[in-house]
Amino acid sequence: GRYLLISSSREGSLPANLQGVWNNNNNPPWSSDYHINVNLQMNYWPAYVTNMAETTIPLVEYVDGLREPGRVTAAEYAGIVTDENNPENGWMAHTQSTPFGWTCPGWDFYWGWSAAASAWLVQNIWEHYEFTEDLKYLKSDIYPIMRESSMFYKQWLIHDENSGRMVSSPTYSPEHGPVTIGNTYEQSLIEQLFVDTIIAANALETDSELRDEISELIPKLSPHHIGEWGQIKEWYEEDNADFNDKDVEKGHRHISHLLGLYPGKAITDETPELLEAAKVTLNDRGDEATGWAKAHKLNLWARIGDGNRSHKL
């Protein structure tokens, strides 16, 4: 893994894509693009914990490059406009991207829509400061991206009268299930973004107004809920005609509703009921999966504290 990342991601280059630098096909799977509903983020999960922070510079630069086209997407799809009065008013990206800064939903709106994908990318680059404590780099390169992302989501959220929550809408759990509002995937990513942005702003002693605004929104997001059979619910409402059985497709490869456990920080030993519900969810999903999905599962079990299960995977 270290070799693959070092070979695919160096300063001055693009970040690692789906096939890295080894693609030899004119028509590779998924165009050898950047999938930002798990794959691009996962490429960089080992970077900091294995002391390879320098390999993440291309990712930070790439995400920064998504901001300009992402502002157009935010204006066209979300009505959040950047102009001379609000020069950094918010950006968004979705499931697919390219070296040319594609930020629209992609080939098919149904699975291509992922309004919280950009929040997930920000989670990756925030880790650069968490591991290096490079305050100068946080101020110059990372925080401006985080700040503008939070600016977008604080305007994007709407009030759901049925649940009382502030929700993202519409939401689609990556490649799985129906379109709903305020699913666990998006709510948890936005919550983590707000939490991280507050920490960053505090470290830089800046943006007190933004800190206050998103601090008020965090408790209204309420991303994690336990279902009737003890699981972390993937969708807020799972008892209507859009749903079959438990998780719509038992054993589905994506486990997007557990991002609060890993790579997020919302489900921990300090939230024992949610931690137990995460175990129920993982056991129900099973161990069989694609290679990348197994990698996610072993990290989830490690966060739970079950090293033996991680080793088995």
Where are these regions (language model features)?
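Catalytic cores of extracellular degradative/oxidative enzymes
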Residues: R2-A116, T132, M151-Q155
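Extended, hydrophobic/aromatic-rich amphipathic alpha-helical segments that build helical scaffolds
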Residues: R2-S8, S118-W126, Y143-Y153, G307
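Carbohydrate-binding/catalytic loop surfaces
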Residues: Q19-S32, I80-D108, G164-Y185, I232-K250, ...
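Short, glycine/acidic-rich hinge or "gate" loops at secondary-structure transitions
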Residues: G12-G20, L138-D141, I158-S168, T206-L210
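Structured loops at beta-to-helix junctions and adjacent beta-edge loops in soluble globular domains
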Residues: S8, T171, G264-A266
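Short, functionally important structural connectors and interaction interfaces within domains
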Residues: R10, L14, G177, D247-K250, ...
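Acidic/histidine-rich catalytic neighborhood
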Residues: E148-A200
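Active-site core of glycosidic bond-cleaving carbohydrate-active enzymes
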Residues: I36-N39, A47-V72, D83-N86, F109-L135, ...
